[in-house]
Amino acid sequence: MGNSHTKEARDPNAPLSPHDPRSHASGHHASGSSSSRPRNRASRSDLGGLFGISAGSSSSTQPPYERRETKQEREARKLERERQARLIERERSLKEEHVDGGYLVTLGTYVGTEDFNKAVVRQLQIERRLAPFWRGLNDFSETWTEYQIVAAARGLPLPAADAIPPDELIPRPISATSPAASTQNIDSLMVPMGGRTQSTASDRSGSGLGSSLPSPTSAPSSKSPFKRSKGIAAALNLSSSRNNSTTDIAAPREIKLPHDPFVNGQPMEVFLYKDGSECPICFLYYPPYLNHTRCCDQPICSECFVQIKRADPHYPDGHGDAQNSERPPEEQAGLLISEPACCPYCQQPELGVTYDPPPFRRGLTYSSPTPHMGTMGTAMSSSSSLNSSLSPSSLASPTSMGHSRRRTQSLSANAPNVVTTDRVRPDWATKLAAQRAHIARRAAAATALHTAAFLMSNNEQQRSLRIGRFSRRNTAERTAPGPSTNAAASNSPARPEAAAAESESASPGTGEARSSSGRGIMGARRSRMEDLEEMMFAEAIRLSLAAEEERKRKAEKEERKEAKRKEKEDKKAAKAAAKSSGSGPYTGSSGNSSIAGSALSLPGLGLGRRRGNSAASNLRMEASVASAVAASGSGSPESATAAGGDKGKGVERPMAANSGDSSEHAEAGASSSMPAGSQPISSPQRPGGHSHLRQISNVSSVSDSSFVDASGGVADEGRTAATGVEPTPNMTSLSEVVDVLDEVDHAKSHDATEVQHLENASDNKPPSKDAGEAPSPPELVVTPGTPALNNEGFETNKQLDIKPTAQHDDQQQQRQQSA
């Protein structure tokens, strides 16, 4: 009894210490207190539970909040501990363990994660089925001395060739006169007994001098390096052995052979590295005793071999169905697959290596021969026993031995002396199965989620339909037509009986519906699932068709682009050919450009200055226009325009005549063939004038001489009867002349040099249109500034020889005022 927290918190059933004063209490007092204390404590705890107060909460404080360690942090701590343990084990193994001069741990050629099974690799190296981890040399020279080779093999600085070698580079053999050494050698060669046998005589016979002396293989002291190494190796590979059935089998016991640093009178490092070879993958120099691939017999060091592994599990999407007609069932089912590693030299699948060990034994070995150790050839022959003297024939040059024993054919991956990458990493099947199970769980969860969502949506739709049906029925009952409200009120006592009768009559139908509701729901679910599958199949077909249509549309678009490009190239080629042949619109009858001479000569206008030595160009222009008019024949006046193309530039030009009659005929023909869209310009001219436009286009003179009303009319229409009317090129005279020349070149295909005068071509003029069919021809508005020639052909002034009218006088005054 009491309020002490220690009394209440102490367990009554806990054993009392001998120093506890309660242990010396009387028996009856202890029995009485033991019977009363639990009852009182239970009552107090019950009361505390009723009031929400826990025992001891008043006197004790809450412990501070401690942050729990996450899974990632635990994994990181675990990996760090394993890394530190590996570093310690590496240092110990490099100092104490070796196999024929090689090591059982990697030497840092690759700094990545070592995910291979270290216990399996260690066992294979001790069995001499896999080459040990030799120390690789960055450089090697055949001129090195023995001490330099020993220093390079041990990772020490390379001394000078003529320097005195240090003591650590001089191997010290064990003297044969030493009794401890001889006893150690004898004891190390004895096969240790695994346990007590049934024969006691054998125990007595073995308990002599040999068993009483210390032996590294049978000493039970805790300082034995073999037990410690096996314990550390087992601790490092505990996680891998859980998922690996091959490591569950107890490995044979390891023993250490007697220390002998010499092989045939040479240091062991010199014997190994004097005929070194280079690994084709890491480019380091190693002893010639390397692994060789089973397929192409290429050398590969152990550090490079243990880095090669299978690819991660993946789907067989990239595998050709046509090439591999007979695929494994995993690929046909669409499951994850894991392909074996390929040879880095010939890409043969299922990479495996073979190893021919050196003809001596040093370091670690197994006490009892394993089933695979009898097939090792040279390593297990009589010349390479544990303590035999090696003959010179067996210690021949390893290079010559390798060349004489070089394999000429590949070995099977299941051969007993072949070590594959799957043997080094035996957990690949477990990883593949775990990945497949993970994918299956995800797929099942996704399918269940989609199915549940689909069924829930359908159930909600059915519930809404059922509620709507009932509501419509109730609404129909509520809105049933009656004779009147009074009649309904008078018949209200009889409604319950009618409702009961209706319910009794409807009860059999509802019972049948309820009994068949379960089957209906299951059938509806199956039908919905089938509908969903059909919908997904139809959607897949639609997407495939849409993709095919898109591909066809793109192909057609590319074809159209290609056709347009070819058409443009053909047009360019045709134009280039036309220019090179001299048949273009800018060439004359002689093939040379005559723009300055004939293309800009417009005879028959009687305007412009006379240029010297231009009679030939005038004659050529007149002959070209005459031949074009003769070729047109008696066709419609629009034929010239239509032949010129769709630009509206085909205009027939009149010819200048020597007589007045021929000039009148030419003017009438030109006026009849003038297009309707041309600007009317009037030009008074003397009948007998022989003149032409300037050979070089002068736009300013033409623009200054054209006075047209804003309404499109012709200024000075009163003078059209007295003077001739002929078309004059306006702002686009050069382009019109070019089009005329093009038409002329096409028309005179029979004779390009034929000359026809105006009086011969005037007979073939096309008939003029009536006034109602076409508008009046354009007229030329002549200003006082327009140049002209007199009757004699000499240029006396720059004014036309006509009388100015009143309108011209007004215009002249306005121009003078504005100037």
Curated annotation (Swiss-Prot):
Q: Does the keyword Nucleotide-binding apply?
A: no
Keyword set, alphabetical order: Cytoplasm
Q: Which residues form a coiled coil?
A: none
On the tree of life, the source organism's domain of life is Eukaryota
* CDD domains on file: SIP5-like
Annotated region Disordered: the residues are 1-79, 190-226, 367-419, 468-522, 549-819
Compositionally biased intervals (Basic and acidic residues): 1-11, 65-79, 549-573, 743-772, 798-812
Please tell me where this protein is predominantly located.
cytoplasm
GO CC annotation terms, alphabetical: cytoplasm
Asked if Cytoplasm is a keyword of the record, the answer is: yes
Q: Which InterPro entries match?
A: Sip5/DA2 (IPR039301)
Recorded protein name is Protein SIP5
Taxonomy, top ranks, is: Eukaryota, Fungi, Dikarya, Ascomycota, Pezizomycotina
Which gene is this protein's source?
SIP5
